[in-house]
Amino acid sequence: TEGEYACIFYKKGNYEVLDQGNFWLSETPDVPGSKGWDAAIERIATWGKFRDKKTGKIFMAVNTHFDHVGIEARKQSALLIIDKIKEIVGKRPAVVTGDFNITDKNEAYKTMVTNKFVLKDAYKISPSHGGVAYSCNGFGKTSQNKRQKIDFIFVTPKIEVNRTVTPMDGESHII
């Protein structure tokens, strides 16, 4: 494929895909390549509706990449993702991951965690953390002590988080 994408990796032995798709973070989410609000470029969210093969429980996973410029685009993207979760799985558990291009002080972050549809920051509700406290490496231009967390995992209340790990640069073998 060409252009923006946000893939979801999963273990086929553990999960069955019941449905899947993507939507564009825009006023016209079903129009491929549509750019929304004040976004600099087209952005997307990919989703999957899964069944856990052991327990039979159904849940939704969403992976996304928010715009790096548009303030309104990020806030509206958060609302759109929440609406899509409600539409696709209702009150069933959901996990939202991605590069949100925001910190936890940003309005879009607050929209994710304070909306009537409750999402929680997995890092903040986890009793244990591993790795580093940032997720943006600064592309070699930012000292380690000034790097920020811009990638998040949000979960619905029915999901228990026991530990979060943000791997240090190059430690992708943790997952």
Task: Please tell me what each predicted stretch does.
Residues 69:
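A short, histidine- and acid-enriched strand-loop-helix "catalytic/donor-clamping" loop
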Residues 1-58, 163-167:
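Structured beta-strand-rich core segments of catalytic domains in phosphoester-bond hydrolases
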Residues 20, 62, 72-74:
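A short secondary-structure junction signal
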Residues 64-66, 99-100:
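Active-site metal-binding loops of divalent metal-dependent hydrolases
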Residues 61, 94-96:
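Hydrophobic/aromatic residues located in beta-strands of well-ordered beta-sheets
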Residues 14, 72, 76, 83-94, ...:
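Metal-dependent phosphoester-hydrolase catalytic domains
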Residues 2-5, 42-46, 57, 62, ...:
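Residues that flank catalytic or metal-binding motifs in active/ligand-binding sites
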